[in-house]
Amino acid sequence: MKIGDGPRKLALVGDTHGGPEANTFELASQLADYFRAHPEEVPLSVRLYIIPTLNPDGLALGTRFNASGVDLNRNMNTDLDACPENDWNNHVQGAYGVESDTGGPYPESEPESGLIRDFLLDAAGVIFYHSDGGDVFPAFCEHAPSIALAQTYATATGYRYDRYWGKYNITGGMQDWAGSLGIAAVIPELINGVDADYDQNLAGVQAVLRQADALLPLPEDRVEQGVPVPALIWRYWKAHGGPEFFGPPLAPATLDGAITRQFFERAVLELRPDQADTPYLVQPAPLGRAALAGRALPIAGEGDREGRTFAETGHTLRGAFADYWDRRDGMLLLGLPLSGELDAPAADGQRRTMQYFERGALALYTEDGGVCPEPLGWAALVRARLQDTTAAQQIR
């Protein structure tokens, strides 16, 4: 549910832990009913989203985990901040001293994790409701906006303010992931596992809304290797692999109509305001398709049954490329395969096994078994500069 159209996006998220914390689903639903009836309480600077459940399968099944048996609040990429204690791990700690391998096979492996990651890309603040502890705590790594939000919320609700969750160590937590991107993020723990604590938490949300301009900081532009990067492009770049996947920024961003575009070593990232509040607000340009323009490539034969074939293009993913594509949210970042595996010159001048996708190309480095994106962003920048009719070109 959405109320308001202001620039400061605040999300209230219930029921990450499914059935055992169903009272957070009830709370978020009641808050949605209240603000639907009282939209005037949402200031003009805010757009408020309320998500009653992030884990509908766990809610239906009565389990803490999603349908794949993964704890969603241990599945986020929390390796982005400066605190190694909260880094993602498959082996996680939980209530009553229970430890289990439920962090997921890799960070953000679950569709629910990817959805909340992409939805919060442009958020100023987020409140994740859990139970039961009767306290409020902010993102783990020192993040002043999260701390201020938690203190304000605790004062208004009467919950205890804790700088950290003290019962066990949380790895892969959603609030820590959000804080690492500059989003003010807190977890209020309801007093028990039954009651919704509606009055207390309504007072907490109202207190935040009254102080929204102070407590919900707008996303900030950053500088990477001396190059300025717009706030939302930076968040996307950081959240999806940063220099490891996209490489560094090559030049400042430019504006093309409503689209903000920036060249990176291995991609061109585009900020498209018409896609606000969707996973495509920032998206890689189709550099793989551009690189193959005019080239005829064979479609994988029917006899090739190993791997995963995409009906849309007729091409197959297998082996190291398939594993890389899966772990890197391939449909979002790379798109569909546009070729099968090819033997072709890679960026280092060596002939390597390569594969092209809508938004990029991958090369296999057999020396270490690693897969690396090709620097198509460099090629696109050179091409753009050569085609720039306003630039002074050298003729020899």
Label each region the model flagged.
Residues 7-13, 19-159:
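Active-site/substrate-binding loop(s) of hydrolase catalytic cores
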Residues 26-30, 67, 71, 111-118, ...:
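Extracytoplasmic/secreted proteins, especially bacterial periplasmic and envelope-associated proteins
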Residues 218-396:
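Extended, compositionally biased repeat/scaffold regions that form elongated interaction surfaces
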